[in-house]
């Protein structure tokens, strides 16, 4: 890889770090190509990315970003998972690591907050942004539904009263 390619890779990584809300560092201890492809596919489906890059280039790209505190985690064969949704990559990686002992979670960062292994696992247990949005919409819609029911209830009662009078007069 020549200097121009390295500079392009560093610029690409830097833009990735600047546009993400979480970075998770994993150590790949002999993942096969099929396993790595399966992990990348799961990450893509979750809206995240998973990149293997040279540690030195990743360190250079981390300089000046909010994630530069994770420089110390970049030792050995590492890969970086990034996403705008902080929960998505954590869930995928934790689930994948449960079934595959060749993937080791090293840590990560969410903004300026550095996460250890336990922090990444705790992050994976949180609901995703889509789940939170669905809950908020449900909470917002519930009072509106109740208001409509309350407003319609007197009209329904009034209709029943008129129906009873009509039935009484017919009898």
Curated annotation (Swiss-Prot):
Keywords: Ribonucleoprotein, Ribosomal protein, RNA-binding, rRNA-binding. GO terms for cellular component: large ribosomal subunit. CDD domains: Ribosomal_L10. It holds the Pfam family Ribosomal_L10. GO terms for molecular function: large ribosomal subunit rRNA binding; structural constituent of ribosome. GO terms for biological process: translation. PANTHER family: 39S RIBOSOMAL PROTEIN L10, MITOCHONDRIAL (PTHR11560). Belongs to the universal ribosomal protein uL10 family. Part of the ribosomal stalk of the 50S ribosomal subunit. The N-terminus interacts with L11 and the large rRNA to form the base of the stalk. The C-terminus forms an elongated spine to which L12 dimers bind in a sequential fashion forming a multimeric L10(L12)X complex. Forms part of the ribosomal stalk, playing a central role in the interaction of the ribosome with GTP-bound translation factors. This is Large ribosomal subunit protein uL10. It comes from Rhizorhabdus wittichii (strain DSM 6014 / CCUG 31198 / JCM 15750 / NBRC 105917 / EY 4224 / RW1). The lineage of its organism: Bacteria, Pseudomonadati, Pseudomonadota, Alphaproteobacteria, Sphingomonadales.
């Amino acid at each position: 890889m020549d200097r121009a390619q390295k500079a392009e890779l560093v610029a690409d990584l830097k833009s990735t770090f600047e546009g993400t809300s979480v970075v998770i560092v994993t150590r790949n201890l002999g993942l096969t190509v099929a396993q790595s492809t399966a992990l990348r596919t799961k990450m893509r489906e979750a809206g995240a990315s998973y990149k293997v890059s040279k540690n030195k280039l990743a360190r250079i790209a981390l300089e000046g970003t909010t994630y530069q505190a994770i420089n110390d985690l970049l030792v050995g064969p590492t890969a970086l998972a990034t996403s705008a949704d902080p929960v998505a990559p954590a869930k995928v990686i934790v689930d994948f690591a449960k079934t595959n002992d060749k993937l080791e979670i090293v840590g990560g960062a969410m903004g300026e907050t550095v996460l250890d292994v336990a922090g990444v696992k705790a992050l994976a247990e949180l609901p995703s942004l889509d789940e939170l949005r669905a809950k908020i919409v449900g909470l917002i819609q519930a009072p509106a539904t109740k208001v409509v029911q309350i407003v319609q209830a007197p009209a329904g009662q009034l209709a029943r009263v008129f129906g009873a009078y009509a039935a009484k007069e017919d009898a």
